[in-house]
């Protein structure tokens, strides 16, 4: 995999923002070892703008950073889950044929965005929950409850914040595509 210098910088910035923004002091505790993180909107934004590879790496590296700085040790199962969430949300520009770059973001695009966020959270953190029960002998009911809360909460958070960001981004892109040079 050959990543350009720009892509590496984007991944570093995204991972830093997602990682630091994911610290407990910026989250809302909702269940045992479970926090709703507004930083999920950062992961969604970088994934939508730069695609699945950047989305995966921002989620994976960023969650690793969160775990390192939080002091509870790196939980690779949940680090992987965040990477999968970013990768799935990163399918948005492929599915929508990068319409947002042309200044288009309609209800259908928003629905696609929310569905990707939901499936990304269910599949990504579902993988984490499954691996926790196998590798760490975590109680199934606990990790299943974590999964349900995280999937619902993150999808809601990503949908609300993401709508405003992506809608405004599309408007900005549309304005810049309408600019013409005077003769």
From Swiss-Prot:
Protein location: Cell membrane
TM region positions: 8-28, 41-61, 75-95, 110-130, 147-167
Recorded topology in the membrane: Multi-pass membrane protein
Keyword DNA-binding: no
Keywords linked to the UniProt accession: Cell membrane, Membrane, Transmembrane, Transmembrane helix
Keyword Transmembrane among UniProt keywords: yes
Protein's name according to its UniProt entry: UPF0397 protein VF_1566
One Pfam family named in its UniProt record: ECF-ribofla_trS
Any single GO CC term annotated in Swiss-Prot or TrEMBL for this entry: plasma membrane
Main location: membrane
Family label: Belongs to the UPF0397 family.
InterPro entries with a match to the protein in the record: ECF_substrate-spec-like (IPR009825), UPF0397 (IPR022914)
């Amino acid at each position: 995999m050959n990543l350009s210098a720009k892509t590496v910088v984007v991944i570093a910035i995204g991972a830093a923002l997602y990682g630091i923004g994911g610290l407990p002091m910026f989250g809302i505790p909702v269940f045992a070892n479970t926090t709703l993180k507004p930083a999920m909107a950062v992961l969604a934004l970088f994934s939508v703008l730069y695609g699945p590879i950047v989305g995966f790496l921002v989620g994976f590296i960023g969650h690793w950073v969160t775990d390192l700085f939080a002091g509870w040790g790196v939980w690779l199962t949940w680090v992987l889950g965040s990477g999968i969430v970013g990768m799935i949300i990163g399918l948005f520009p492929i599915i929508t044929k990068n319409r947002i770059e042309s200044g288009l973001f309609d209800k259908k695009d928003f629905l696609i965005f929310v569905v990707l966020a939901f499936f990304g959270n269910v599949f990504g953190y579902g993988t984490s929950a499954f691996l926790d029960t196998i590798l760490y002998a975590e109680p199934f009911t606990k990790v299943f409850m974590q999964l349900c809360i995280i999937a619902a909460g993150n999808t809601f958070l990503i949908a609300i914040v993401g709508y405003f960001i992506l809608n405004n981004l599309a408007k900005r892109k549309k304005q810049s595509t309408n600019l013409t040079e005077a003769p």
